[in-house]
Amino acid sequence: MAAKIRKGDKVIVLTGRDKGRTGEVFEVRPADNKALVRGINIVKRHQKQTQAQEGGIISKEAPINLSNIAIVGKDGKPTRVGFKIQADGKKVRVAKRSGAEIDV
């Protein structure tokens, strides 16, 4: 199955403590059905000291379930994603809200 949310997409959070906030997807984990979004779902982790890195408490993004995020359409509102086959046989993602192509 083709991925509806991909790396580089601008998404909005639908549920949870970050509801309504937007960010860019920088990693997708299809096996876990999760994604990492820049600036969203920030958690604090205790980092052990290594030769290369100093120890302490660091803040980093935790994975968020794909069902809890949606792509932001051209109008700035969340939209569902569908697929359309073009005349040349190429499969593209389209926004269900507006019908506009996402892969431009």
From Swiss-Prot:
Alphabetized InterPro entries for the sequence: KOW, Rib_uL2_dom2, Ribosomal_uL24, Ribosomal_uL24_CS, Ribosomal_uL24_KOW, Translation_prot_SH3-like_sf
Top-rank taxon, per record: Bacteria
PROSITE patterns listed in its UniProt record: RIBOSOMAL_L24
GO molecular function: rRNA binding; structural constituent of ribosome
Protein's GO biological process: translation
Entry keyword set: Ribonucleoprotein, Ribosomal protein, RNA-binding, rRNA-binding
GO cellular-component term (any): ribosome
Pfam families listed in its UniProt record: KOW, ribosomal_L24
Similarity comment: family membership: Belongs to the universal ribosomal protein uL24 family.
PANTHER family in the cross-refs: MITOCHONDRIAL RIBOSOMAL PROTEIN L24
Subunit field text: Part of the 50S ribosomal subunit.
Function description: One of two assembly initiator proteins, it binds directly to the 5'-end of the 23S rRNA, where it nucleates assembly of the 50S subunit. One of the proteins that surrounds the polypeptide exit tunnel on the outside of the subunit.
Name used for this protein in its record: Large ribosomal subunit protein uL24
Organism listed in the record: Rhodopseudomonas palustris (strain BisA53)
